[in-house]
Amino acid sequence: MWPPDPDPDPDPEPAGGSRPGPAVPGLRALLPARAFLCSLKGRLLLAESGLSFITFICYVASSASAFLTAPLLEFLLALYFLFADAMQLNDKWQGLCWPMMDFLRCVTAALIYFAISITAIAKYSDGASKAAGVFGFFATIVFATDFYLIFNDVAKFLKQGDSADETTAHKTEEENSDSDSD
């Protein structure tokens, strides 16, 4: 989320008191930390990627296969942001405006899913198209929730910055008014 959360707590020790052997190298190193996956942002990104994948599979099996590109792209983008947030790439790559990219991704995904879901349900009669439309509506809700939360976090962050600027400007104004009264 924005501003970036501090480092998540490491996984707690097992009940036995000590860890059994060294960490397993390989693919497990690529998996996001459990603390991130249990956070609200992690859950939203998991839901976005899961619903996008299910919607993609439904569109592949349906007669509305013209719509399969949008869920595939959203699935890949959700996976990218999942791993980027989990690996804290937003801290490493400061040149990119991560909250704005995530916000725009969620807004466009919600709008596109809403439009293609309405079309899939209204225009096509097969069951896979109807299922894709229903999963698309669920994905619309998840993406809309995500962009609402991102917007609130960014607005809160900007409001904190504005209040600090106002305080500095107010102090400067008081100092200037004190010097004029002498």
UniProtKB/Swiss-Prot annotation:
Keywords: Chemotaxis, Cytokine, Membrane, Transmembrane, Transmembrane helix. Residues 1-21 are annotated as: Disordered. Residues 36-155 form the MARVEL domain. The chain crosses the membrane at residues 64-84, 101-121, 131-151. It is found in: Membrane. Expressed in the leukocytes, placenta and testis. Residues 1-12 have a biased composition (Acidic residues). GO terms for cellular component: cytoplasmic vesicle; cytosol; extracellular space; membrane; nuclear membrane. One of its GO terms (biological process) is chemotaxis. The keyword Cell cycle does not apply. It is a multi-pass membrane protein. Its main location: membrane. Belongs to the chemokine-like factor family. Pfam families: MARVEL. It comes from Homo sapiens (Human). InterPro entries: Marvel, MARVEL-CKLF_proteins. This is CKLF-like MARVEL transmembrane domain-containing protein 3. One of its GO terms (molecular function) is cytokine activity.
